[in-house]
Amino acid sequence: MNRTEKEQVIGELHEKMAMAKAAILAEPKGLNVATVTELRRKLREAKVEYRIVKNTLAARAAKGTPVESIAEKFVGPTALVMSYDDVVTPAKLLADFMKDRENFTIRTAVIEGRVVDAKGIQSLAKMPGLQELRGQIAAMIAQPATQLARVLGAPGQQLARVLGARREQLEKQS
């Protein structure tokens, strides 16, 4: 890689690191190509980026971004996982991926500007994702309206049942 290519990579990484809400550093030791491809596919489906980065280029790209606070962790084989929307989804996907693989470990992360260790990522993985939270909020907002409709409809339903019972009673008498 010549100097111009390196500068392009650094510039591109710098922009992505600056935009990322979550940047997770992982150590992908002992993974075969098929396993890494499967992980990349799952992450891509969730709109999460997975890159194997050259440490010196990544450390230079991190300058002036929140990732700079963990730049000293760019040592040895390093995978950089970045999410630009949701901070929980990449943590969940990586935690799930790590269950079956002893060699794949999370070193550290920067989540919305805060440094988080591997245990913090595991805790974050147990939280509901952004879509789940939106669903829960929508359900909480809709619940009072549903209950109000049920309460307002109850007298009418009761009246209909009373009238129906009275009709049956009159039909039996005739």
From Swiss-Prot:
SUPFAM superfamilies named among the record's database cross-references: Ribosomal protein L10-like (SSF160369)
Single GO BP term: translation
The keyword Ribosomal protein belongs to this UniProt entry's keyword annotation: yes
Domain of life the protein comes from: Bacteria
InterPro entries, A to Z: Ribosomal_uL10, Ribosomal_uL10-like_sf, Ribosomal_uL10_bac, Ribosomal_uL10_bac_type
GO MF term (any one): large ribosomal subunit rRNA binding
Any one GO CC term of the record: ribonucleoprotein complex
Signal peptide extent: none
Pfam family, one: Ribosomal_L10
Alphabetical keyword list: Ribonucleoprotein, Ribosomal protein, RNA-binding, rRNA-binding
Record family assignment: Belongs to the universal ribosomal protein uL10 family.
HAMAP family assigned: Ribosomal_uL10
Function: Forms part of the ribosomal stalk, playing a central role in the interaction of the ribosome with GTP-bound translation factors.
Complex formation: Part of the ribosomal stalk of the 50S ribosomal subunit. The N-terminus interacts with L11 and the large rRNA to form the base of the stalk. The C-terminus forms an elongated spine to which L12 dimers bind in a sequential fashion forming a multimeric L10(L12)X complex.
Name assigned to this protein: Large ribosomal subunit protein uL10
Source organism: Anaeromyxobacter sp. (strain Fw109-5)
Origin organism lineage: Bacteria, Pseudomonadati, Myxococcota, Myxococcia, Myxococcales
Gene name of this polypeptide: rplJ
